[in-house]
């Protein structure tokens, strides 16, 4: 579960390395986000020459969480880190590459471009 002030690694080549959650989108007073949810975040670490700079406010979708997610068949999927991918308004990623595996739940949220760019879908 991702909440306000949570720091996440960025799993794309948009130029950001780490982001800090400002707000979880979707509903009034929503506290937590899980895999496939959209957040508003601030870039805390960035690589030089990237598309996004330190201090930029961006939207991102969560692709990996340590807490994990329960699937319809009763199984759980968990990862070793919390990670997100920075997206545009049309739900397409800002970067051109995705690093590391992503969860299958992104397919249900309409993030097909992220799923197709990912090296592995679990």
From Swiss-Prot:
Annotated coiled-coil segments of the chain: none
Gene Ontology BP, a term: translation
Amino-acid biosynthesis in keyword set: no
Superkingdom of origin: Bacteria
HAMAP family: Ribosomal_uL14
Known partners and oligomeric status: Part of the 50S ribosomal subunit. Forms a cluster with proteins L3 and L19. In the 70S ribosome, L14 and L19 interact and together make contacts with the 16S rRNA in bridges B5 and B8.
Matching PANTHER family: 50S/60S RIBOSOMAL PROTEIN L14/L23, LARGE RIBOSOMAL SUBUNIT PROTEIN UL14M
Primary role: Binds to 23S rRNA. Forms part of two intersubunit bridges in the 70S ribosome.
Protein name: Large ribosomal subunit protein uL14
Organism: Streptococcus suis (strain 05ZYH33)
Upper taxonomic lineage: Bacteria, Bacillati, Bacillota, Bacilli, Lactobacillales
